[in-house]
């Protein structure tokens, strides 16, 4: 409204209009309307709502209709209507708003008024209700308000209508004089009319008293009906009239409530109230707009002339009409007094019924009657008779006889009824199908246009609800309005959708208020049901309208007396009709039958409702049609207009009061419904869910009717009305909607089928399991595809429960019925999978689904569970089913609804992505690795490692990305692992059925609240299980459940049966046991996402620790750990094939005993995996990768390091299961390996400790062993989650500090982060923290500088970083960054302080995967500052050497941490100790002084050159000359030409990059910086390559490996994205190896750490084993070539189950680990692996060394850094040393694993370690292998250079140089032996640790 537009925004318009029509009309009309509403008395109020609120009203309209449709320009195109339309345009700006108003009036007068009354309507309605506290008062006051407002209208219309135009003339459209005259006349007449209205209001007050009783009866009846319908919504919804009016009312009330809430959110609720207000203001505005026709005519200057002429003619007629109106007023007063109670009460009751029936329609009827009459009379008055007369003349003259008009009106009524049915249908469908609503809106608006057009014709006889003129004018206006509708419906489609929503609500309200909207629709239904009654009413009303039309026409005709007489007759007819309505209401009240009452009320109301719906439609069309009508009304005599006005004012008042009463009733009903919904959401879902189920049943039979009835009762209405007349339209519209729904269903079905198909592949495997335990695993595994689909099915069946489950799964997937329909059809498609689900939408979804859904419901919101268990959003489902109810829920779920739509869009996109990704499995494999990186980045970057994506839905894009990636990966894993999964699942199914039946209850108890039904859609989301889990959305939790599978999919995409097993089991079992894994584990790890292992490892761990009780509580963590540890234990015990889901599924594969064992070991191994005592070796705390990231990292670490040897130790089946687990839980693979390793892990822990602390200290090793063991136990509890969460800020601050402090040493940070990534488990992290603490404490005592990091070395920081690393395990890089940042800040600073080794160690060993490829060069470049530090470390070299243990410990912490993370922490820690010894001896022995001397020698040559060019600008030529000079000098200074080649290239590229920043600057300005840059680069590179030379010198096998590395480096060149490694990979690798072999002993001895740090050649101990990103950066990420080679070689060479691909990276890492572990544990297997890996490693490992960034190759070459070297070197030496390996089996296995891993990582082409730390985890594989290989094969592994040990940039060496370097490295092997703990000491330690590190491998980084 003008003033009330604002209040009307929400729902207030509705309340405001009814009460506004009473007192608020005066207030509003006086206060609000007349500013804008002068144009039309009632309409000006409406239109002021429209004008002032034309935009505001459009806003209001938009506000109201946002759900169905914007409703913005409901009838904007209706502007064609001349005067009223022009004004309506100005006010409504479109006839769309007229229809909005009409629909709103229909809906709002009753529905929205109550809704608005219930809601914020009261503010406006307060003023409105001031006069009319009750409906009768509303009527009287409406009449009084209308009279007052019309009197004030006249005044205000004079005053405000002028808006500066004192006269209603507002000679805007017409001659100012004529308009002024006309408006003055109109004002006078309006004054008269208002006076009469005041009199009538007095009369109406009496009538209102009567009507109050009647309305009270109506209220009671409707409330009873509403209550009955609330309880039994679908009892009457079975048929078109079957949907009880109350149910429809409730639905529409809920729809309206939801709309209003939504529109309150959208601030577009006004449109619905505006419908009424517009109706009121239409009547008022029509009066005023008649008076304002001048203003309208201003807009319609063309029509001004015509209308002005007509106005002149009509002025005469108007005078007649004034007389007639006076007579009519008297007669009307008499009639109102006489029949006013009955006609006024009866017909008002009937109007009320009509209003309540049409709630807006009847209000419009009353209002429209008044509006039509008033605005007609006002149109004749404001529009001097010309407007009404023109309308009336055009109607009368142009129109047919009144009989024909009555026929037309009746036809139009039928059309309107049909269209109303359609409208209701589409109101329903607009909720279900906004598109359908739009189309329906078009049709309905056309119908409503016709209705409003007829209303334009009709309302003119004030008494005639359907004005006789309305017939012709109806036809005309129908043509006009239909044309306008055609246009306006298109524009107004939004509004019409709003109107339809309102109509929907109105239909429901009408069903309630009319006793049934169905009777509007059921008017035909009632004509059928209450045919005599309804038809009598309708016939009578039609007759009455005919009479009133004819009499109205006669009154509109020139015969004023006849018009009056006919008006009296019409009034009497209306009174009879209203009496019948009242009788019907009484019958309704008496019958309490929603149906009979509906039929009765509808019967009586049908005619009125039709008339009122017509007029309601006419009323917006009065806004529209009032253009035509006002034009025609302008032609009407003002007297007739006044009479019409008064009559219609009275009618409007009565009807408004009735509508208000009905509105109140409806509001009460809505409130009751809402209360019932709130109180009995189950009943709602049962009533509406069961009704939806019934509806679903009948909707299945008559889905349109039932679903639509569910939606808005519209289908029923549509059936009722549209069956007779709207059959064509309705059938078409419904057919369109059904087609749309089917398309959406097909779409969703396809999506669901895609998901289900994939899932059925899994389920096919699990379905054997699922077959027996469909409700258990199938329901969960399938429930992921099927709960979304089952819920979709339930939605298809319209079982709100299922739909609600989908809503929870999808967040709001069924937020809209369209979604529901789509989902419903998906569900219907899904029934094959979950037929019971769809068959039993609520109750008979399998218990598993029920529990899952129920648990998901509980988990999500503890929403009431329907029998379906999907019930949680049951009200929401009802919302969808029952739009009103659904919208009621939408209050709460609107965000969810939009989110559901988004998720559906996501799901559609994801399904498309799934389809695409199914065809791009290799890409997805790469994406799997990228996904791990992305999960690291996203999780860490977005909301923190755990909460980043999960906690914030704000990261929905991240969810989408991860979701899509996960879906891709899941689909790939499903497809790839389908057969293997099926095989193993068949085994597991038998046991899984049992376990899942066992697990399902507890897991469902725990996690069913977060079942993974959306997994099919969100399965990709499951990739960041925590992120998804952090969404707290069951679907996301389910996503999380897939995260392990996804992880495994990436890791084990191709050949891992267990990966398919793990991928599927987690998807299926986690789906099946989302409680355990997803819901619980993820819930527990919500803030602590375990992208790879979160759901598995945590759950399994906790499951193991806490079998069932803690499973429920901690199964969130336990389930995650369980998955991971189940993998470990599965591999170690062949039981922990999976986490809980892996366990169930993998157990299914494996054995029932395996299942039980696996479940036990899911718990145990997950516990051990979460650093719980390994089931195999309880003393051993296997890595706990609580976070998926930790799992992934641990899996990578395990794969790369420990898991290999452990897996080798484990059986092949265990390996398979573990690979499955690894695939399932990338960390799980390592974890699974770790349990087996745990026996060795004890030793390995000690070994890792020895390693880590052999650098830093063996004391710290012991401490770490202690800490690791204690931490193993502590970390198994999921402490990393809480610790990380508690310490996240601290961790991040420390990491930020670490990063900021090491900005100049990106490589240090990268490798540090990589190494930290290796710290996959809390155990490893805590051990690393303790080691760091010890190191820091030692260094603090030894070196104050070393103590700089103690702050970050705090155990809390460690724990935080551990916790952090848990997410960083999910975000392998990020959290490891965080941890490494914390840890490096500690360890690195210690190491840095100790010597550059820390920086280089950290940077080298901790390869931050994300930076791995890019940062290799960048890191070297940024190691400039690291050079400075390394020089500082050179100065601290003695200090560093003295603290070599600490330094080695820091690098060893990193290396060992990486080793711990890497799994064979023994191997890696051995390599780290070696490298720490190498760092301590060779790495620190990188003579920084020698480097300084060398650099000085170079700079001595460079400085003079620069001095010569000091005045020159640093041009590219000059810089190139400097670079070439430096390179030449470097070559001169370099001992190895081979190294110089590589180093020259790498250094040249680095120098080029470093010097590039000086380009354009004057040399004298940047000369110093240039020299510093050059010196730093030289120092970094020389130190690094000397380290690499030392490493190369450490073993001759490194020469072979150097060849391999060179080959691999060639491959890496193509793949590695290291700045120069790619281009210089081959040569540099050789040179690097040679150089490393030669120089690393020196440089390592001098300051390997410094050089490593500075040169990114982290000290050998800091195994430079690059993460897959670094070593196989492009290969692993971009291609599976590395993986393929490695896999091929591994698979070729040995029983390596490594399905190394990008996905297999983890899987391959695990398999390599497993295979290596198995084979190594089987010394033959390890021999084979060694042979494999020798061949592969000689190929792939040397290739890997080559492919690995050159520093990786060098590291591999450098025995002191045996991690990488062990790959290639271990491949050779492992084969040779396998038997001789001091790490019998374990270390050899680890070395083999390392070889496999390094092979994959180093042999990037093969990416066998794609999942290996080299590629994915920074140092996991290489350090890992180096450690394992070194520990077990100390001498040989000394020859092995960790990839991390490899300088990030290798000096280019020719093969000859590399061979020389390798020879020197062979010599250095003894150095590395010495370095590794006195040479033999650490061998022994490492050998001892090899087994302990098997545990630490199990513990992954726990050893570290």
UniProtKB/Swiss-Prot annotation:
Record field: compositional bias (Basic and acidic residues): 43-60, 520-534, 1103-1117, 1151-1162, 1616-1625, 1881-1897
Biased amino acid composition, Acidic residues: 442-452, 535-544, 806-830, 1649-1658, 1680-1695
Composition bias, Polar residues: 107-118, 280-298, 349-361, 461-470, 687-706, 779-804, 1064-1073, 1093-1102, 1141-1150, 1668-1678, 1698-1720, 1728-1737, 1779-1791
Region (Disordered): 1-135, 159-179, 265-303, 338-361, 376-407, 430-489, 520-559, 686-706, 773-840, 991-1018, 1063-1082, 1088-1225, 1616-1741, 1774-1838, 1865-1904
Location of the protein in the cell: Cytoplasm, Cytoskeleton; Cytoplasm, Cytoskeleton, Microtubule organizing center, Centrosome; Cytoplasmic granule; Cytoplasm, Cytoskeleton, Microtubule organizing center, Centrosome, Centriolar satellite
GO biological process per UniProt: cilium assembly; intraciliary transport involved in cilium assembly; microtubule anchoring at centrosome; non-motile cilium assembly; positive regulation of intracellular protein transport; protein localization to centrosome
Pfam families (UniProt xref): PCM1_C
Coiled coil: 171-212, 301-334, 403-429, 562-592, 636-686, 731-768, 895-927, 970-1000, 1421-1447
InterPro entries registered for this protein in UniProt: PCM1_C (IPR031446), Pericentriolar_Pcm1 (IPR024138)
Signal sequence segment: none
Any GO CC annotation of this UniProt entry: cytoplasm
Keywords: Cell projection, Cilium biogenesis/degradation, Coiled coil, Cytoplasm, Cytoskeleton
Top-level lineage group: Eukaryota
Bias (Low complexity) ranges: 338-348, 471-482, 1173-1182, 1800-1812
Purpose: Required for centrosome assembly and function. Essential for the correct localization of several centrosomal proteins including CETN3 and PCNT. Required to anchor microtubules to the centrosome. Probably involved in the biogenesis of cilia.
Assembly mode: Self-associates.
Family membership: Belongs to the PCM1 family.
Protein's name according to its UniProt entry: Pericentriolar material 1 protein
Organism of derivation: Gallus gallus (Chicken)
UniProt gene name: PCM1
């Amino acid at each position: 409204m003008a003033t009330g537009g604002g209040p009307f925004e929400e729902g207030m318009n509705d309340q405001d209009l009814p009460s506004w029509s009473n007192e608020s009309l005066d207030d509003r009309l006086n206060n609000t309307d007349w500013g804008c509403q002068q144009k039309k008395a009632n309409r000006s109020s409406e239109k002021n709502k429209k004008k002032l609120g034309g935009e505001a009203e459009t806003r209001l309209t938009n506000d109201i209709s946002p759900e169905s449709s914007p409703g913005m320009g409901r009838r904007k195109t209706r502007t064609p209507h001349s005067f009223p339309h022009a004004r309506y345009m100005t006010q409504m700006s479109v006839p769309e708003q007229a229809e909005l108003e009409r629909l709103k009036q229909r809906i709002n007068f009753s529905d929205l008024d109550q809704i608005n009354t219930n809601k914020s309507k009261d503010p406006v309605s307060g003023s409105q209700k001031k006069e009319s506290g009750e409906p009768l008062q509303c009527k009287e006051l409406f009449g009084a308000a209308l009279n007052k407002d019309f009197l004030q209208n006249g005044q205000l219309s004079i005053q405000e209508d002028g808006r500066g135009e004192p006269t209603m003339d507002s000679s805007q459209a017409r001659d100012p004089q004529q308009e002024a005259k006309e408006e003055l006349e109109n004002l006078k007449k309006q004054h008269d009319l208002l006076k009469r209205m005041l009199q009538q209001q007095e009369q109406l007050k009496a009538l209102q008293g009567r009507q109050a009783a009647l309305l009270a009866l109506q209220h009671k009846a409707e409330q009873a009906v509403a209550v009955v319908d609330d309880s039994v919504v679908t009892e009457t919804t079975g048929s078109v009239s079957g949907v009880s009016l109350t149910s429809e009312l409730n639905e529409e009330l809920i729809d309206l409530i939801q709309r209003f809430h939504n529109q309150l959110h959208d601030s577009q609720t006004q449109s619905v109230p505006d419908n009424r207000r517009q109706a009121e203001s239409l009547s008022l505005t029509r009066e005023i707009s008649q008076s304002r026709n001048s203003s309208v005519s201003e807009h319609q200057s063309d029509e001004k002339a015509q209308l002005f002429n007509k106005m002149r003619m009509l002025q005469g007629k108007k005078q007649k009409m004034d007389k007639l109106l006076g007579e009519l007023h008297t007669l009307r007063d008499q009639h109102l007094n006489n029949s006013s109670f009955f006609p006024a009460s009866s017909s008002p009751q009937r109007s009320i019924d009509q209003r309540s029936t049409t709630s807006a329609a009847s209000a419009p009827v009353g209002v429209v009657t008044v509006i039509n009459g008033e605005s007609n009379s006002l149109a004749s008055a404001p529009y001097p008779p010309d407007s009404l007369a023109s309308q009336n003349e055009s109607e009368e003259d142009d129109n047919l006889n009144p009989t024909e008009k009555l026929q037309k009106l009746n036809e139009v009524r039928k059309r309107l009824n049909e269209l109303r049915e359609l409208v209701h249908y589409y109101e329903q469908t607009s909720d279900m199908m906004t598109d359908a609503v739009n189309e329906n809106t078009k049709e309905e608006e056309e119908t409503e246009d016709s209705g409003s057009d007829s209303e334009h014709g009709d309302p003119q006889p004030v008494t005639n609800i359907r004005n006789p003129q309305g017939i012709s004018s109806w036809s005309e206006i129908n043509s006009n309005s239909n044309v306008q509708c055609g246009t306006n419906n298109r524009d107004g489609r939004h509004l019409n959708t709003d109107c339809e929503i309102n109509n929907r609500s109105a239909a429901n309200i009408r069903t309630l208020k009319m006793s049934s909207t169905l009777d509007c629709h059921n008017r035909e239904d009632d004509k059928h049901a209450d045919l005599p009654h309804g038809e009598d009413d309708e016939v009578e009303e039609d007759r009455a309208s005919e009479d009133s039309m004819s009499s109205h026409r006669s009154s509109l005709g020139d015969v004023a007396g006849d018009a009056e007489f006919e008006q009296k007759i019409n009034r009497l007819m209306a009174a009879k009709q209203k009496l019948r309505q009242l009788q019907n209401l009484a019958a309704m009240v008496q019958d309490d039958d929603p149906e009979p009452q509906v039929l009765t009320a509808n019967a009586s109301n049908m005619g009125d409702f039709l008339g009122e719906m017509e007029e309601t439609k006419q009323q917006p069309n009065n806004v529209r049609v009032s253009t035509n009508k006002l034009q025609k009304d302008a032609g009407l005599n003002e007297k007739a207009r006044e009479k019409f006005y008064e009559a219609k004012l009275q009618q409007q008042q009565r009807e408004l009061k009735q509508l208000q009463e009905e509105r109140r009733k409806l509001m009460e009903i809505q409130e009751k419904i809402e209360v019932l919904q709130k109180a009995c959401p189950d009943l709602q879902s049962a009533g509406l869910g069961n009704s939806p189920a019934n509806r679903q049943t009948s909707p299945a039979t008559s889905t349109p009717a039932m679903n639509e009835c569910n939606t808005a009762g519209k289908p029923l209405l549509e059936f009722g009305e549209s069956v007779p007349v709207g059959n064509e339209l309705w059938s078409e519209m419904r057919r369109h909607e059904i087609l749309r729904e089917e398309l959406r269903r097909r779409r969703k079905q396809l999506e669901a089928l895609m998901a289900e198909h994939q899932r059925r592949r899994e389920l096919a495997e699990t379905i054997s399991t699922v077959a027996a335990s469909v409700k258990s695993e199938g329901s969960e595994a399938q429930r992921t595809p099927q709960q979304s689909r089952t819920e979709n099915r339930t939605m298809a069946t319209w079982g709100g429960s299922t739909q609600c489950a989908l809503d929870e799964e999808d967040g709001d997937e069924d937020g809209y019925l369209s979604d529901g329909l789509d989902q419903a059809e998906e569900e219907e498609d899904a029934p094959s999978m979950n037929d019971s689900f769809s068959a039993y939408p609520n109750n008979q979804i399998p218990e598993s689904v029920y529990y899952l859904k129920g648990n998901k419901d509980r988990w999500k919101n503890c929403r009431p569970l329907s029998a379906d268990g999907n019930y949680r959003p049951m009200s929401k489902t009802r919302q969808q089913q029952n739009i009103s109810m659904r919208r009621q829920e939408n209050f709460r779920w609107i965000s969810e609804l939009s989110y559901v739509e988004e998720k559906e869009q996501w799901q559609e996109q994801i399904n498309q992505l799934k389809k695409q990704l199914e065809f791009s499995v290799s890409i997805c494999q790469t994406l799997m690795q990228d996904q791990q990186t992305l999960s690291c980045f996203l999780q860490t970057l977005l909301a923190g490692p755990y909460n980043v994506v999960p906690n914030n839905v704000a990261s929905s894009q991240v969810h989408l990305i991860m979701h899509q990636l996960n879906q891709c990966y899941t689909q790939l894993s499903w497809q790839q692992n389908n057969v293997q999964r099926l095989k193993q699942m068949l085994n597991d199914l038998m046991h899984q059925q049992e376990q899942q039946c066992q697990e399902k209850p507890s897991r469902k108890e725990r996690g069913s609240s977060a079942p993974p039904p959306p997994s099919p859609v969100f399965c990709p989301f499951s990739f960041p299980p925590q992120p998804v889990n952090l969404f707290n959305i069951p679907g996301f939790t389910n996503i999380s459940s897939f995260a392990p599978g996804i992880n495994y999919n990436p890791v084990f995409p191709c050949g891992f049966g267990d990966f398919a097993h793990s991928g599927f089991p987690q998807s299926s079992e986690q789906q099946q046991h989302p409680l355990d894994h997803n819901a619980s584990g993820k819930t527990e790890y919500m803030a602590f996402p375990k992208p790879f292992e979160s759901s598995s490892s945590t759950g399994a761990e906790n499951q193991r620790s806490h079998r069932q009780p803690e499973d429920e509580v901690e199964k969130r963590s336990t389930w995650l750990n369980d998955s991971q540890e189940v993998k470990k234990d599965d591999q170690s015990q062949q039981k922990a094939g999976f986490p809980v889901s892996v366990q169930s599924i993998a157990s299914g594969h494996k054995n029932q005993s395996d299942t039980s064992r696996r479940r036990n070991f899911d718990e145990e191994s997950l516990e051990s995996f979460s650093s719980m005592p390994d089931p195999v070796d309880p003393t051993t705390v296997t890595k706990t990768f609580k976070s998926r990231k930790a799992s992934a990292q641990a899996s990578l670490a395990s794969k790369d390091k420990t898991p290999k040897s452990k897996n080798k130790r484990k059986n092949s089946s265990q390996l398979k299961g573990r690979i499955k687990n690894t695939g399932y839980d990338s960390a799980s693979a390592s974890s699974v390996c770790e349990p087996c390793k745990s026996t060795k892990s004890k030793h390995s822990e000690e070994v890792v400790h020895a390693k880590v602390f052999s650098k830093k200290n063996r004391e710290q090793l012991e401490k770490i062993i202690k800490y690791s063991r204690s931490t193993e136990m502590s970390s198994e509890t999921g402490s990393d989650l809480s610790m990380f969460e508690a310490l996240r800020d601290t961790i991040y601050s420390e990491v930020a500090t670490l990063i900021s402090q090491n900005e100049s040493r990106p490589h240090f940070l990268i490798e540090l982060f990589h190494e930290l990534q290796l710290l996959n488990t809390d155990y490893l992290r805590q051990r690393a923290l303790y080691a760091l603490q010890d190191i820091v404490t030692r260094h603090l005592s030894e070196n104050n500088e070393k103590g700089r990091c103690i702050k970050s070395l705090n155990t809390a920081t460690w724990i935080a970083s551990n916790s952090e690393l848990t997410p960083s395990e999910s975000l392998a890089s990020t959290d490891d960054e965080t941890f490494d940042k914390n840890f490096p800040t500690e360890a690195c600073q210690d190491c840095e302080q100790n010597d550059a080794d820390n920086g280089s160690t950290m940077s080298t060993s901790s390869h931050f995967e994300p930076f791995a490829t890019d940062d290799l060069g960048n890191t070297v470049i940024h190691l400039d500052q690291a050079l400075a530090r390394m020089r500082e470390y050179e100065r601290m070299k003695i200090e560093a050497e003295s603290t070599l243990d600490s330094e080695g410990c820091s690098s060893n912490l990193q290396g060992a941490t990486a080793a711990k993370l890497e799994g064979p922490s023994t191997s890696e820690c051995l390599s780290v100790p070696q490298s720490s010894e190498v760092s301590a001896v060779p790495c620190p022995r990188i003579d920084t002084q020698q480097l300084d001397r060398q650099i000085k020698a170079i700079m001595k040559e460079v400085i003079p050159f620069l001095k010569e060019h000091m005045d020159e600008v640093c041009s590219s030529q000059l810089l190139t000359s400097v670079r070439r000079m430096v390179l030449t000098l470097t070559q001169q200074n370099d001992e190895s030409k081979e190294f110089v080649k590589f180093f020259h290239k790498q250094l040249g590229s680095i120098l080029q990059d470093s010097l590039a920043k000086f380009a354009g600057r004057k040399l004298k300005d940047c000369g110093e910086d240039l020299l510093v840059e050059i010196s730093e680069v030289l120092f970094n590179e020389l130190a690094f390559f000397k380290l690499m030379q030392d490493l190369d010198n450490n073993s001759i096998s490194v020469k072979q490996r150097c060849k391999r590395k060179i080959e691999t480096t060639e491959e890496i060149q193509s793949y590695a994205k290291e700045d120069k490694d790619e281009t210089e990979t081959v040569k540099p690798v050789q040179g690097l190896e040679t150089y490393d072999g030669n120089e690393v002993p020196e440089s390592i001895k001098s300051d390997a750490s410094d050089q490593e740090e500075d040169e990114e050649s982290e000290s050998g101990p800091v195994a430079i084993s690059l993460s897959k990103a670094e070593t196989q950066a492009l290969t692993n990420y971009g291609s599976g070539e590395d993986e393929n080679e490695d896999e091929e070689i591994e698979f070729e060479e040995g029983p390596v189950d490594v399905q190394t691909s990008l996905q297999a990276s983890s899987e391959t890492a695990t398999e390599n680990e497993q295979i290596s572990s198995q084979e190594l544990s089987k010394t033959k297997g390890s021999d084979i692996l060694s042979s494999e890996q020798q061949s592969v490693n000689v190929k792939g490992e040397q290739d890997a060394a080559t492919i690995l960034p050159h520093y990786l190759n060098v590291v591999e070459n450098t025995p002191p850094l045996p991690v990488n070297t062990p790959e290639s070197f271990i491949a050779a030496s492992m084969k040779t040393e396998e038997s001789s390996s001091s790490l019998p089996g374990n270390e050899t296995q680890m070395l083999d694993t390392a070889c496999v891993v390094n092979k994959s990582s180093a042999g990037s082409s093969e990416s066998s370690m794609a999942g290996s730390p080299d590629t994915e985890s920074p140092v996991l594989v290489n350090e890992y292998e180096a450690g394992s290989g070194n520990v077990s094969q100390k001498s040989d592994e000394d020859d092995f250079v960790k990839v991390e040990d490899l300088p990030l940039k290798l000096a280019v060496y020719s093969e000859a140089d590399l061979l020389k370097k390798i020879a020197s490295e062979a010599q250095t092997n003894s150095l590395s032996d010495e370095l590794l703990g006195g040479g033999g000491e650490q061998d022994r330690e490492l050998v001892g640790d090899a087994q302990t590190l098997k545990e630490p491998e199990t513990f992954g980084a726990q050893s570290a």
